[in-house]
C-alpha cells in the first residue's frame, strides 16, 4: 500500500485526506489496522522499558527466595543474578523481544519521516482520528497501573508434577544454615529426640544389615525410575504407557515352569515304548553327544502326541520334564496352550512365539510343550483368517527355518491330528508321531497299581486283574477317577457320621479300608470318556450266554486267527534283546517281513444265520478279543451323524482312518438293513474303497447278517466269496440248553439265607463320635510366618513407593518446609557434657527444655518436623499406614499455626490439603485395610519381642550377680540395655538376635512371638508355644525351664490376643508334634497341672479312637429261621419240561424265558417253602409256551 501511494506522489494518509472519494468503506479498515499496529508498537516499547526499570530495582533478598523459573536476566547490568541457573531460553527470549521492538521502531520512524507535511483533512477524518486517540489513551491508562504493580514476569511454562531425580540437595536457595561445618547442640539434641519418637511406631520388619540397605537402595532406584518416567516430557500426553519400550520379560511369559520332582516315568503305565523313544530324543543327546557326532546327525527334536482324551499325553510331557531335571542335569520346560500366544494386536502373537523360542535357545537344553496345538496351528485354507495363517507360518519357520534351534525339543499334543496343519507333520518339525490309544488290559492293570500303590492295605493283585478285565474302554484319567471314587465310597461306608455333622469329628483314618464293593459301586456310576460321545462296539460275552454261544465263539475265533493273525509286536528295545545271526543280510530281513504279510489275503468274515441266534452278542465279543486293534464302525448311526456332509464323504473319511491305524477292523453290525437303506452311490463307494485295499493289508472286514446262508444279499456273496469267510449259526443243542437253565434250578432249591436280599438286612446303629479338637495348621507355621513377613514387606514397599511419589511433588512446591520452620541457630540449647552453648539465651527466641522446643516467654511447643525428616522416616520403614504419614504432615501445619505468619500458614494449609487429597487418591478400601492389619501385626511383634528380650536380660543379670567368671557378659548386657533404651528398634533387634544366640540358656528363637501372633490370627489353628532349637530339653528339664522360656507377657494378666498359660498347655496336648525341626515331643503328663486345663471334649487317650468295627454296633440277637421245605423230586419234572419245551428255540427266545424265571425267583426269594416256587415256575413255563406258539 505504501508503494502504491508513493507512485501517486504521496502517502496513503495524504491521499485519504485530500481526496474525498478515497474515503470509502473498503479503505477505512486497512488504514485503521495500520495505525493500530503502529500505536501498539509504541505502547509495547513503553511497557518493556518500564519492566526493565522494575527489574533493576528489585531487592537481592527477594530475588534469592524466588524459584529458579521466575528469576530473569538483568538487562541493565548485563549480568545474571544466579550464575547457576540453567535458563538460556529466557535470555534468548528477552533478546529476541528487544530485537523485534527495535525493528518495529525503525520501520515506524522511517514511515513517519517519509510522510509529507501534515495537511488538514475533512471533518469526518478528524473526528475519527480524535476518537481513536482517546480510545488508545484510555486503554493505555487501564493497563499501565496493573503492569507497573508487577514485580516479576509470569512464568507460563507448565510445572513438573515431580522434581527431577538428579536434583541437588545442596541448592543454596532451598537450604538454610548450609555453611556450617558441623551441627550445633540444639540440632543434635532435636535429631536425637526425633529418633526417639520414631522408636514408638517403627515396624520390626528386618531392615538392618546389608540386605536391608540393598533393598532400600533398590526401592529408591525403582522409585526414581517411576518418577523420572512420569516427569519425562515425552510421556506428557496419551496413555500412561504411551511411548514406553517394554522389557523382554514383559512381552512374553518366558519363565520355565516348575517341575514336580515326585513325578517320573514310573507314574506312566502302559506306554513303555514311547518312553524309550522319548529318552533317546532327550536323554541320549545330553549324556552321549559323541554318538551323534560320530554319525554327524541331529537327534529327533519334535514329536506330536495324539489320541483320545485322557490317555496320558500331558502326563507324559510332565514326566519327561521331571525325568530330565535331575540333580546332574537341568532341562528347562516351557508349556504353552493355544490361547497363551494369541493376542488382539496384529503381530503380537508372532512376536510372542519368537521370544519364546529365543528364551528356549538361551536356556537350552529345553523343552517347549504346546498343549492342544490344533488351536494354535490349524489347517491353513482360503476361508481362514489371515492372522491364523501368519501364526502358523511363523511357527513353521521357527521350528525348521534358516537358523537351527539347537537343543530345543518341541512337543505338541492334540486329540484332533487332522486339524493340525500338514506342514507341521513332517520330519524336521515333528519328526515322530505317537498315537496314545486306550490302554489294553495289561496297561489298565498297571495304571490301577500305580494309583493304589500307596494305599494301606494295598489292593490285592487278583482285584487289580479283575478291575482291568471289567474296565474295557477306560482311559488313564477314567481309571484314576475310578480309584478316587472307590476311596470316597470306603469313607462313606466306614464313617457315614461325617456327612451328617457340620463339625469336625474324631476318627481314625487307619480303619478306612477299600473293599470290592467300593469299586463295584464306582463302576456303576462312572461313564468312560470313550463312551460319552459314542458307544463302544466291543463287549465281552456274558456268562449267561456262554453255554449257548461258547462253541460258536471258539470256532469263529480260530477262523479269524487264520484269516488275520495279529502277533504281538516287540518294540525296538525288546527286539535287540534277542540274537539275530543275519543282521547284515538284507534279503533275509526282507524275507522275514514278507512272511508276516504274505500269509494274509483279504481278511473278511461274515456271521450269518436266522434272526435271534446270537449275532448281536458274538460280534462285540469278537471285537473284545482284538484289544489294541483299531475298530471303525460303519453302521448307519456313524454315517448319518454328521448332517453337513454326504454319506459318501463319511465313508471316505472312515476309510482314511482305517488305513491310518493298521491293524484295524471294519465293522458293520446289521449289514442287511445297511444294504437296503444306503443309496447305490454309497454302496458303490464303499465297494470301490474296499477293493482298493491291498490283499495283504491287516484290515479285517467283519459283518453280521440276520439272514440264512441261502438268502444272503448278492452283494454279500460278492464280498464274501470264500466259504472260509462265512460262518452260519445254528440253533442251540440239547446239552447247551441244559447248561443254560442249570443255574436257575440251583436258585430254586436255595434257601432264603443263600439268596441276595432273601433276609432283610439289619440297620446299622452308628455311635456318636466325639468332637475332634481344632486341627493344627495344614502347613508348617514357620513357613507360613515367613510368607506373612514377606507379604508385609511387599505391602510396605508398595506404600513407600506411593508416599515417595507424593513427597516428590511436595518437595518441589513447598521448599519452605524442607527444613524445620525454626532455625537451629535460634534455639538455645546447653551441651550436657560441657554445659556450654553456642549462643546466649538472650540472643535466641526458642529453647530446648525437657526434650521439647519451646518459645521463650510463652508455652508454645514445636515439633521441629520437616519434609526431610518425613522422607527419612519413609525409607526407614516408619510408616505402616498412610494415616501415620498424614500425622507428621499435620505437625508441620501445627508449627506453622503457632508461628502466626499468614504466608506460612497459607502454604502449610495448602500442603496439608494436597496431602489429604493425594492419600485419598492413592489408597482404596482393600489397601487401607491391609495396611491397618500389617500395622497391628508389627505392633504385636514389637511388644512380644521387647517383652521376651527384657525377660532374658533380667534373668541374665540375676544369674551374673552370683557368678563372676564371665565379666564380659555384664558389659555386653549393659550395652544391650542402653541400646534398647536409646537406640532405634532396628539396632535393638540386631543385638537381640546376637545375644539370644550366645547368652540365652535356652536359645529361644526370635520367631516365637511371630508364631503366637499367627496362632491368634488364624481361626483354624490351635494356640501353641514353639520352642525351636536343635537340641530340645528333656521332659524333666522342661519342668525346671518352663518358667524361663515363657514370655513375661504370659504371666499374670494376659494381653488381648496372646494365649494364656493354660491354653498353651492344652494346645501342647492336642498337637503332639508341632515342631518343624523334628525334635522329640513333650509328654502330656509334664504339662497338665490340673483337670481344669483339659477341655471336656478333648480326649486324653489314644485308645478312645475306636476302629470301624467298634463304631458300628450291630444288634446281635438270635434269629430263629423256619425250616426249609423242599422236595428234590419236584425239581426233575421242571427240568424235563424246560428241555422239551425249548427245543428249537432261538437264543433270544431262551433269554426271554430265562428272564421270566428270574423274575419269579426274585419275587419268592424270602419264601421258605421252595415247593411253591417250583409250582410257579412250571406254571410260568407253560404260559410262556402258549404265548410263544401264538
UniProtKB/Swiss-Prot annotation:
ATPase histone chaperone which facilitates loading of histone H3-H4 onto DNA in an ATP-dependent manner. Plays a genome-wide role in nucleosome organization and establishment of chromatin. Also plays a role in heterochromatin assembly by stabilizing recruitment of the histone methyltransferase clr4 to methylated histone H3, to promote the transition from H3K9me2 to H3K9me3. Residues 1-185, 204-253 are annotated as: Disordered. Its main location: nucleus. Disruption phenotype: Abnormal nucleosome distribution. Decreases level of clr4 at the subtelomeric and pericentromeric regions and at DSR (determinant of selective removal) islands containing meiotic genes; decreases di- and tri-methylation of histone H3 'Lys-9' at these regions. Abnormal heterochromatin formation at the pericentromeric outer and inner repeat regions, the subtelomeric region, and the silenced mating-type locus. Impairs centromere function; leads to abnormal mitotic and meiotic chromosome segregation and sensitivity to thiabendazole (spindle poison). GO terms for biological process: nucleosome assembly; nucleosome disassembly; transcription initiation-coupled chromatin remodeling. ATP binds at residues 309-314. Its EC number is 3.6.1.-. One of its GO terms (molecular function) is histone binding. Residues 112-131 have a biased composition (Basic residues). This is ATPase histone chaperone abo1. Signal peptide: none annotated. Homohexamer. Interacts with the FACT complex subunits spt16 and pob3. Interacts with histone H3-H4 (via N-terminus). It catalyses: ATP + H2O = ADP + phosphate + H(+). PANTHER family: AAA DOMAIN-CONTAINING, ATPASE HISTONE CHAPERONE ABO1. It comes from Schizosaccharomyces pombe (strain 972 / ATCC 24843) (Fission yeast). Belongs to the AAA ATPase family. Residues 794-922 form the Bromo domain. Pfam families: AAA (PF00004), AAA_lid_3 (PF17862). Residues 1-11, 141-152 have a biased composition (Basic and acidic residues). Keywords: ATP-binding, Bromodomain, Chaperone, Chromosome, Hydrolase, Nucleotide-binding, Nucleus. GO terms for cellular component: chromatin; nucleus. Residues 52-62, 82-106 have a biased composition (Acidic residues). It is found in: Nucleus; Chromosome.
Amino acid at each position: 500500500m505504501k508503494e502504491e501511494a508513493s507512485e501517486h506522489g504521496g502517502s496513503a494518509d495524504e491521499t485519504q485526506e485530500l481526496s474525498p472519494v478515497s474515503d470509502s468503506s473498503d479503505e477505512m479498515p486497512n488504514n485503521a489496522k495500520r495505525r493500530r499496529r503502529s500505536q501498539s508498537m509504541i505502547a509495547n516499547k513503553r511497557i518493556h522499558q518500564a519492566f526493565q526499570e522494575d527489574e533493576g530495582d528489585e531487592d537481592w533478598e527477594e530475588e534469592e527466595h524466588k524459584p529458579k523459573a521466575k528469576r530473569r536476566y538483568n538487562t541493565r547490568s548485563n549480568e545474571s543474578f544466579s550464575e547457576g541457573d540453567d535458563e538460556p531460553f529466557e535470555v534468548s527470549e528477552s533478546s529476541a523481544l528487544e530485537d523485534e521492538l527495535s525493528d518495529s521502531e525503525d520501520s515506524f520512524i522511517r514511515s513517519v519521516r517519509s510522510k509529507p507535511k501534515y495537511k488538514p483533512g475533512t471533518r469526518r477524518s478528524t473526528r475519527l482520528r480524535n476518537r481513536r486517540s482517546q480510545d488508545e489513551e484510555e486503554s493505555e491508562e487501564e493497563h499501565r497501573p496493573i503492569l507497573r504493580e508487577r514485580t516479576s514476569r509470569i512464568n507460563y511454562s507448565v510445572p513438573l508434577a515431580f522434581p527431577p531425580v538428579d536434583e541437588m540437595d545442596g541448592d543454596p536457595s532451598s537450604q538454610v544454615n548450609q555453611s556450617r561445618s558441623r551441627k550445633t547442640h540444639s540440632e543434635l539434641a532435636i535429631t536425637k529426640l526425633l529418633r526417639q519418637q520414631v522408636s514408638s511406631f517403627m515396624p520390626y520388619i528386618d531392615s538392618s544389615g546389608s540386605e536391608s540397605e540393598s533393598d532400600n537402595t533398590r526401592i529408591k532406584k525403582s522409585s526414581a525410575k517411576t518418577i523420572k518416567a512420569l516427569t519425562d516430557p515425552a510421556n506428557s500426553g496419551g496413555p500412561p504407557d504411551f511411548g514406553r519400550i517394554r522389557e523382554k520379560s514383559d512381552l512374553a511369559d518366558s519363565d520355565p515352569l516348575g517341575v514336580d520332582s515326585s513325578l517320573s516315568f514310573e507314574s506312566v503305565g502302559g506306554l513303555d515304548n514311547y518312553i524309550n523313544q522319548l529318552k533317546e530324543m532327550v536323554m541320549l543327546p545330553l549324556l552321549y553327544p559323541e554318538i551323534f557326532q560320530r554319525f554327524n546327525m541331529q537327534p529327533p527334536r519334535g514329536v506330536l502326541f495324539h489320541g483320545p482324551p485322557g490317555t496320558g499325553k500331558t502326563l507324559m510331557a510332565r514326566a519327561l520334564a521331571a525325568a530330565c531335571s535331575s540333580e546332574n542335569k537341568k532341562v528347562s520346560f516351557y508349556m504353552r496352550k493355544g490361547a497363551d500366544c494369541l493376542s488382539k494386536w496384529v503381530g503380537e502373537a508372532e512376536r510372542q512365539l519368537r521370544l519364546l523360542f529365543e528364551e528356549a535357545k538361551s536356556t537350552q537344553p529345553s523343552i517347549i510343550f504346546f498343549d492342544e496345538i490344533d488351536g494354535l496351528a490349524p489347517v491353513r485354507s482360503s476361508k481362514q483368517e489371515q492372522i491364523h495363517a501368519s501364526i502358523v507360518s511363523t511357527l513353521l519357520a521357527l521350528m525348521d527355518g534358516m537358523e537351527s534351534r539347537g537343543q530345543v525339543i518341541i512337543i505338541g499334543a492334540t486329540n484332533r491330528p487332522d486339524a493340525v496343519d500338514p506342514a507341521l507333520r513332517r520330519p524336521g518339525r515333528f519328526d515322530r508321531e505317537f498315537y496314545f490309544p486306550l490302554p489294553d488290559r495289561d496297561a489298565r492293570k498297571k495304571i490301577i497299581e500305580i494309583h493304589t500303590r500307596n494305599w494301606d492295605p494295598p489292593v490285592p493283585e487278583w482285584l487289580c486283574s479283575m478291575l482291568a478285565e471289567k474296565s474295557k474302554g477306560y482311559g488313564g484319567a477314567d481309571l484314576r477317577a475310578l480309584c478316587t471314587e472307590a476311596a470316597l465310597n470306603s469313607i462313606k461306608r466306614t464313617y457315614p457320621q461325617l456327612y451328617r455333622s457340620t463339625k469336625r469329628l474324631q476318627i481314625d483314618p487307619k480303619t478306612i479300608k477299600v473293599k470290592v464293593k467300593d469299586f463295584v459301586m464306582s463302576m456303576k456310576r462312572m461313564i468312560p470318556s470313550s463312551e460319552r460321545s459314542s458307544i463302544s462296539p466291543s463287549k465281552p460275552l456274558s456268562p449267561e450266554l456262554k453255554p449257548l454261544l461258547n462253541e460258536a465263539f471258539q470256532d469263529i475265533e480260530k477262523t479269524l486267527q487264520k484269516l488275520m493273525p495279529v502277533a504281538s509286536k516287540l518294540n525296538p528295545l525288546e527286539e535287540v534283546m534277542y540274537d539275530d545271526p543275519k543282521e547284515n543280510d538284507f534279503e533275509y530281513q526282507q524275507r522275514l517281513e514278507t512272511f508276516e504279510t504274505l500269509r494274509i489275503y483279504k481278511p473278511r468274515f461274515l456271521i450269518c444265520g436266522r434272526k435271534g441266534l446270537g449275532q448281536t452278542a458274538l460280534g462285540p465279543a469278537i471285537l473284545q478279543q482284538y484289544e489294541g486293534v483299531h475298530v471303525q464302525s460303519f453302521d448307519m448311526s456313524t454315517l448319518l451323524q454328521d448332517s453337513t456332509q454326504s454319506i459318501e464323504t463319511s465313508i471316505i473319511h472312515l476309510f482314511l482312518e482305517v488305513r491310518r491305524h493298521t491293524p484295524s477292523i471294519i465293522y458293520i453290525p446289521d449289514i442287511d438293513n445297511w444294504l437296503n437303506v444306503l443309496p447305490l452311490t454309497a454302496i458303490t463307494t464303499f465297494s470301490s474303497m474296499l477293493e482298493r485295499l491291498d490283499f495283504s493289508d491287516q484290515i479285517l472286514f467283519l459283518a453280521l447278517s440276520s439272514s440264512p446262508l441261502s438268502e444272503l444279499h448278492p452283494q454279500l456273496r460278492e464280498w464274501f466269496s470264500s466259504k472260509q469267510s462265512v460262518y452260519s449259526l445254528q440253533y442251540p443243542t440239547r446239552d447247551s440248553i441244559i447248561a443254560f437253565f442249570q443255574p436257575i434250578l440251583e436258585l430254586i432249591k436255595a434257601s432264603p439265607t443263600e439268596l441276595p436280599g432273601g433276609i432283610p438286612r439289619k440297620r446299622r446303629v452308628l455311635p456318636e463320635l466325639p468332637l475332634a479338637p481344632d486341627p493344627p495348621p495344614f502347613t508348617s507355621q514357620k513357613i507360613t510366618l515367613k510368607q506373612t513377613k514377606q507379604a508385609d514387606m511387599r505391602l510396605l514397599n508398595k506404600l513407600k513407593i506411593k508416599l515417595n511419589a507424593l513427597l516428590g511433588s511436595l518437595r518441589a512446591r513447598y521448599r519452605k518446609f524442607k527444613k524445620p520452620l525454626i532455625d537451629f541457630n535460634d534455639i538455645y540449647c546447653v551441651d550436657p557434657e560441657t554445659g556450654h552453648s553456642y549462643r546466649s539465651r538472650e540472643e535466641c527466641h526458642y529453647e530446648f527444655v525437657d526434650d521439647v522446643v519451646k518459645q521463650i516467654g510463652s508455652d508454645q511447643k514445636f515439633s521441629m518436623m520437616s519434609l526431610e525428616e518425613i522422607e527419612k522416616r519413609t525409607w526407614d520403614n516408619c510408616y505402616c499406614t498412610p494415616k501415620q504419614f498424614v500425622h507428621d504432615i499435620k505437625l508441620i501445619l501445627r508449627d506453622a499455626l503457632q508461628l502466626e505468619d499468614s504466608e506460612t500458614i497459607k502454604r502449610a494449609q495448602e500442603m496439608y490439603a494436597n496431602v489429604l487429597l493425594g492419600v485419598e487418591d492413592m489408597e482404596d478400601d482393600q489397601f487401607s485395610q491391609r495396611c491397618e492389619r500389617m500395622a497391628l501385626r508389627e505392633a504385636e511383634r514389637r511388644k512380644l519381642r521387647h517383652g521376651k528380650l527384657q525377660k532374658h536380660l533380667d534373668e541374665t543379670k540375676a544369674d551374673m550377680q552370683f557368678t563372676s567368671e564371665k565379666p564380659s557378659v555384664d558389659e555386653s548386657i549393659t550395652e544391650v540395655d542402653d541400646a534398647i533404651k536409646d537406640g532405634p528398634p532396628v539396632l535393638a533387634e540386631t543385638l537381640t538376635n546376637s545375644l539370644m544366640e550366645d547368652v540365652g540358656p535356652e536359645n529361644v528363637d526370635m520367631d516365637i512371638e511371630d508364631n503366637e501372633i499367627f496362632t491368634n490370627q488364624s481361626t483354624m489353628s490351635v494356640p501353641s508355644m514353639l520352642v525351636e532349637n536343635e537340641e530340645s530339653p528333656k521332659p524333666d528339664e522342661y519342668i525346671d525351664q518352663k518358667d524361663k522360656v515363657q514370655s513375661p507377657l504370659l504371666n499374670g494378666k494376659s494381653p488381648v490376643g496372646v494365649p494364656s498359660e493354660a491354653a498353651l498347655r492344652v494346645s501342647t496336648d492336642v498337637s503332639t508334634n508341632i515342631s518343624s525341626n523334628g525334635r522329640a515331643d513333650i509328654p502330656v503328663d509334664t504339662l497338665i497341672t490340673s483337670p481344669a486345663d483339659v477341655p471336656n471334649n478333648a480326649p486324653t487317650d489314644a485308645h478312645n479312637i475306636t476302629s470301624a468295627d467298634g463304631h458300628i454296633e450291630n444288634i446281635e440277637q438270635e434269629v430263629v429261621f423256619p425250616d426249609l421245605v423242599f422236595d428234590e423230586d419236584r425239581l426233575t419234572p421242571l427240568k424235563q419240561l424246560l428241555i422239551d419245551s425249548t427245543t428249537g428255540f432261538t437264543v433270544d427266545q431262551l433269554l426271554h424265558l430265562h428272564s421270566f424265571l428270574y423274575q419269579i425267583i426274585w419275587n419268592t426269594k424270602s419264601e421258605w417253602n421252595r415247593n411253591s416256587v417250583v409250582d410257579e415256575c412250571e406254571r410260568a413255563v407253560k404260559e410262556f409256551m402258549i404265548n410263544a406258539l401264538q
